[in-house]
Amino acid sequence: MKSKIFMKKIISVILFSAIGLNGIAQQKPYYSQYVLNNYILNPAVTGIENYVDMKFSYRNQWTDIDGAPVTSYVTINGPIGKKDKRTTATSLQIPGDNPYKSSVLDDYEPASPHHGVGLTLISDKTGYISRTTLGLSYAYHMPVSSTTSLSAGLIAGITNVNLDRSKIVWGSLDPNDPAIGYSNGEITKSMPEFGAGLWLYSRDYFIGASVLNIVPSKLKFVKNDIYGDNFYPHLFLQAGYRFFISDDISILPSMALQQINPLPVFVHSNVKLQYQNIFWVGAGYRIKDQLSGATAMAGINIGRTFNISYSFNSAVNSKLNTYAGKTHEILIGLNLGKKDDTCPKNIW
């Protein structure tokens, strides 16, 4: 028992060294189900659907480690001036028909030129540090061929970082370390955030590129420039392609590359198997050195306006898997203002 407690403490030190105040690996939260809400990583997705798309997410990471990351968010985005609500390639013309089947999508046409606006609210807590981000996004969509559309988007917002010294277990740490401030209570600092992205999409594929934290900044809890945490730009590259196994079953493999200078590229891969517009299952794998992990996912659409999905993540590293516990993530979606004859037009 003592050895297990000791090992858990060692694992905790390793984890928080990677994601703590002076770390750069998790300045942005990680999401297992990003492929279901690409908007969270790329503002160019803003307003891509035929309705207002609202998502709620809760992620509990490494459940056996006290103070491990807990992330929740709300996103909402929708189109402005989109005139093809009843004529999109996946519009449901026959009640009960499958809007995702291959024969329906054969007549796919790109979206008409339109705008999109959105809002993002993210809460991320790790140990004695919590971050709250509020962002507003805008995107413009236009067809570039008879089957393909391109969108460009921007996001601007503010992040509040709160350090609660009362929750710090000091141990060998120095309470007078200026990197974590001198106040005995809570310290809050704010900084602006900006991001930009491009999104190329059709009935079969999507390719996206985005940069979040596009303007590097330094978070300081004291005035001395020597101390503080540098916030680096995060580059994301995403791509996916859908194949039809049958008229009602499709498979969507996708991949995301994440680059945070000076760290190596992180690779996130997923595959999603969907039956009609009813339910889906999926799996993923993250290559991230000692934090690599495998993910199992499943989701269901309930009616035309509500959907829910769940993912379970397990570390590949045996010691991390044993002592850190699993990671759970729930995503709930609401399609607001969606007409009875309109279904999601995009492959995710």
Residue spans for each PLM region:
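Subset of outer-membrane beta-barrel
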Residues: Q26-W348
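Sec-dependent N-terminal signal peptides
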Residues: I5-I19
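Sec/Tat signal peptide C-region and signal peptidase I cleavage site
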Residues: L21-A25
